[in-house]
């Protein structure tokens, strides 16, 4: 994306909607400018960063302060016209230079602490997700050079109060907000507009000659395809939560093979016939797991443990401990069955495959060998 693509509005029903940027972008920009201020020993009032999606942001700096080898800076969160609980709050970074050559990243006041497994971060760590961790560390490294070290603390004085308006406590993230964002940009869109933009990408892929498509919920799926399957990500299209819609669009466009790739936290819902996977539509993850574990003869003790879990990742640990990892192949086959049932009136339905992977990019299960699927995708 170019810089202009951030400034360009998103149109919905004749109304121009303004884009925003994530808490991850705020933390990255704050850390970068704080590091630069320590090095230069003067205040800086504007900073630019390149987001993971390639968009350049030029952001105003608030509350800049330098004291010796330490500097503090803040960026105000702007969600554009997609206002959430963090909109308008200040995200601060405190950067202290040292001679260690290493960059350490911690969360301070107002940043949540991970107290449960299942969110992809270690217990006890700050709720700063993987992509923002990478962008913060990269921005600071770019600023200070290869030899110096730095201690980076991200904090948000309003964080604990704001977090009460989020789902963090339900996820076991306590005491503050999460620093999140895989693209760095907040795009305000109605559901229909968002679906249409995803479908447009499918149309572009089909027009380029592709006949096989990989549908993923988001960026993690694309990374898995690239790193673990060795398949050209040109075949990957994001489906977000709109599984049924995107499958129907792929059929309409004449794709001969659809491969669903994702973490069980999303794809397991399809096994229950849920084709819109946003939590406000339906959840049933634990109920689906319990039902299919029971079909495979799992003991009542395991069924009870899984039923009591709040996250799929937590349930997966119990499943592994009881030796029921084969459920993922079973679920993948069930997902494909549900898709084919949905397409039962289609004249020439495509081949459907499903692959489930873990947060650390390991294959959990598939409806048939992944090597076979990958080989077909490379044809």
UniProtKB/Swiss-Prot annotation:
Any Pfam family hit: CbiD
Keyword Protease: no
Catalysed transformations (reactions): Co-precorrin-5B + S-adenosyl-L-methionine = Co-precorrin-6A + S-adenosyl-L-homocysteine
Top class in the EC scheme: transferase
Enzyme Commission designation: 2.1.1.195
GO function term, MF aspect, one: cobalt-precorrin-5B C1-methyltransferase activity
Pathway where it operates: Cofactor biosynthesis; adenosylcobalamin biosynthesis; cob(II)yrinate a,c-diamide from sirohydrochlorin (anaerobic route): step 6/10
Swiss-Prot/TrEMBL GO biological process terms: anaerobic cobalamin biosynthetic process; methylation
Record key words, sorted: Cobalamin biosynthesis, Methyltransferase, S-adenosyl-L-methionine, Transferase
PANTHER family in the record: COBALT-PRECORRIN-5B C(1)-METHYLTRANSFERASE (PTHR35863:SF1)
Family: Belongs to the CbiD family.
Name the record gives this protein: Cobalt-precorrin-5B C(1)-methyltransferase
Organism listed in the record: Salmonella schwarzengrund (strain CVM19633)
